Amino acid sequence: MLDLKRIRNNPEEIKKLLSNRGEDFDVAVIDEIVTLDEERRKILVEVESLKSKRNQVSAEIPKLKKAGEDVTEIMNDMRKLGEEIKNFDTRVNEINERIEYIMLRIPNIPNPEVPDGETDEDNVEIKKWGEPTKFNFEPKAHWDLGTDLNILDFERGGKVAGSRFTVYKGLGARLERSIINYFLDKHTTENGYTEILPPYMVNRDSMTGTGQLPKFEEDAFKVENNGYFLIPTAEVPVTNMYRNEVLSGDILPIKHAAYSACFRAEAGSAGRDTRGLVRQHQFNKVELVKFCKPEDSYAELDKLVEDAESVLQGLGLPYRIVRICKGDLGFTAALKYDIEVWMPSYNRYVEISSCSNFEDFQARRANIKYRETPKDKPKFIHTLNGSGVAIGRTVAAVLENYQKEDGTVEIPEAIKRFMNVDFIK
């Protein structure tokens, strides 16, 4: 959520900054907010004047009665004044609801470093690590490898649940678990994160706090009759752990690493990546979430990206980093980097992590603040998050990049201690 004061003072600047944001967003609502805010402030001034008048007259009525004067007309005037105040209060409530409705749907303002552009083709590559894997044979796609090795069962996943669900079997299940363990160990013992195991269901306030609601409700799995949502990412419960709290500045930054299952309807992705593990309704992920002071947030973002990189480097998977352009930035981020792993079956890099600085956008929605001392006025914190990284896509990348001509898959050195085998065959 943006700062209403900033909108009030600089509406044209805000409209300009949001005009090429790439969201389905009409900047004309900024003018509506300014108009409503001005009306509300005028009403509040008028209400205060009316209440002051009512209090003064109310204090005089007993004196007039004691003096034997007729106060009938004055009492009638007071009732009318009370109705007027009530009507003003009703209008203020209507304005508040409308402003909140609009504010919850305004995307974040891009950082000046965000490149111009409309689609993912305009994202800017800033780094490559490793070289795309070369083969002296025709490599298989991970869905074929998984089926041939009897470690991924897409058919039974579909039978049990439907399309975009997978059953992991045998060494496939162990590979998934090994990668989870490796990621969590790396982030907690080397990268300085505290491990969190969050709830997999959250309430509406939590989904609103991180920006999934109201805009992306169609992509969420909702549990009917009780208002719970299955989490699309551990970012939601971990960020909302501190909702409506004022944190002490001396404990910042807070760094959490959370493994969870994630659930997404993928309503806008019909026909995309329909085979394999790349786009599933349910998948596992290790999420990195940070809370820090505003002046530290971009340095913390750089470190967050490095932490996500570290697990891919440990697995020896080639990847690149792109800075996301304005048109592809999404709703909540002020600046975002995608880490894309090389996927031989696609003959291109595929997103495996997004690392974002939301600045105070989520903190305003979730009301997360900090202060240096108990006497200081609380200020909104900055929140960041990144995938550290998506597990299913890592499984796919390992299978494809480590496959051998005989159809077996070598286990990366970093996870052999968890797998207890050198090859899947």
From Swiss-Prot:
Binding-site positions, L-serine: T233, A234, E235, E287, S387
Ranges in coiled-coil conformation: none
Keywords from the named record: Aminoacyl-tRNA synthetase, ATP-binding, Cytoplasm, Ligase, Nucleotide-binding, Protein biosynthesis
Gene Ontology CC annotations of this record: cytoplasm
Keyword Magnesium: no
Record GO biological process: selenocysteine biosynthetic process; seryl-tRNA aminoacylation
Enzyme class of the recorded protein, top EC level: ligase
Catalytic activity, as annotated: tRNA(Ser) + L-serine + ATP = L-seryl-tRNA(Ser) + AMP + diphosphate + H(+); tRNA(Sec) + L-serine + ATP = L-seryl-tRNA(Sec) + AMP + diphosphate + H(+)
EC numbers for this chain: 6.1.1.11
Pathway: Aminoacyl-tRNA biosynthesis; selenocysteinyl-tRNA(Sec) biosynthesis; L-seryl-tRNA(Sec) from L-serine and tRNA(Sec): step 1/1
Entry binding sites for ATP: R264, A265, E266, E351, I352, S353, S354
Any single Pfam family the record assigns to this protein: tRNA-synt_2b
SUPFAM superfamilies, per the entry: Class II aaRS and biotin synthetases, tRNA-binding arm
GO molecular function, one term: catalytic activity, acting on a protein
InterPro entries in the record: aa-tRNA-synt_IIb, aa-tRNA-synth_II, aa-tRNA-synth_II/BPL/LPL, Ser-tRNA-ligase_type_1, Ser-tRNA-synth_1_N, SerRS_1_N_sf, SerRS_core, tRNA-bd_arm
PANTHER family membership: SERINE--TRNA LIGASE, SERYL-TRNA SYNTHETASE
Family (UniProt): Belongs to the class-II aminoacyl-tRNA synthetase family. Type-1 seryl-tRNA synthetase subfamily.
Oligomeric and partner information: Homodimer. The tRNA molecule binds across the dimer.
Cited function: Catalyzes the attachment of serine to tRNA(Ser). Is also able to aminoacylate tRNA(Sec) with serine, to form the misacylated tRNA L-seryl-tRNA(Sec), which will be further converted into selenocysteinyl-tRNA(Sec).
Written domain comment of the UniProt record: Consists of two distinct domains, a catalytic core and a N-terminal extension that is involved in tRNA binding.
Official protein name in the record: Serine--tRNA ligase
